[in-house]
Amino acid sequence: MSRLVVASIGPASSVQDGGRHGAQRYGLTVSGAMDRLSLAAANTLVGNEPFAASVEIGPFGATFTARDGAVRVAISGAPRNADVAGNPVAMDTSVTLKDGETLTLGFARGGAFTYLAIEGAIKGEMVFGSLAVNARAGLGSPYPRPLQAGDEFSVDAASGAGELRIELPKPISGPIRVVLGPQDDEFDDANKALFLGSEWKISATSDRMGYRLEGPAIKHLHGHNIVSDGTVNGSIQVPGNGSPIALMMDRGTSGGYPKIATVITADVGRLAQTSAGTAFRFRAVSMAEAQDEVRKFAQLIRNLPDRLRSADSVALNIEALSDANVAGYAVSAMDAGTWQVTAEP
């Protein structure tokens, strides 16, 4: 066995996987990765199951050192500078650390969370089928708390497999999509329109439990207390001060504030990766559209292995080029015989 040692790491970093399912009836929240697509991409790069336990790294930097043998890892998620012994490591790629080598990750340059997957996955004692850490509840393994310098993982020795990159689809842009409710009837039409028509920013005081939204105060129709009922990842509740809170992975399993809307499953990761202070909007969609989008999201996760490429091959994102009309320029702007410009971009 090799070891991967945490040499340094910032706050808001912990072991996360696909989450703890089937235990909410006991008051145990799901927890798990804030951005499931990035978790799955990193795991796919090193041959793990998509939602295997990995390191969720918060906005600040981190360094990891291989000991007692080589360790193969991969990174995906919020972009940041990364290198091994001064050699750059691209996002969405795998890399093998030789014994004694250190992977250095800088501050996130957009988004919040980056995922470090380890070939063979992190091992520990399952709690209701998951290693996911919920620091408030003291749940998770092997460290039921945020990671700190000196922590280490016993991992499988690197397989020697060739390094890979993964071609992810162009990120979705535009408003975060929500389904109104389940208590949207606790708000009049004017305040629902205010919620959907306003720009919002995520407060710097947000965490894995909830994202506090900065913007106009939303007024209740009948008061801010309801009989406590169940919550889900992405529930947007409005407390008495009128400032909405989007409930995230470490949320409580029930709550007593009206929920004006619910972020669709396919967009929860997008919201999670929205940096504090970045302006964004919400857009209401139908339940049918939300269900269609989650089916597409599940299909994307299943098909991630089809997006793997050799790390030595040239990365050419045709989807992005097409959207930017760059691919059309490359095809139509030159005469094949003379290599003279024949069309404007």
Residue ranges and their predicted role:
Residues 1-345:
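Conserved "landmark" site that anchors the functional core of diverse proteins
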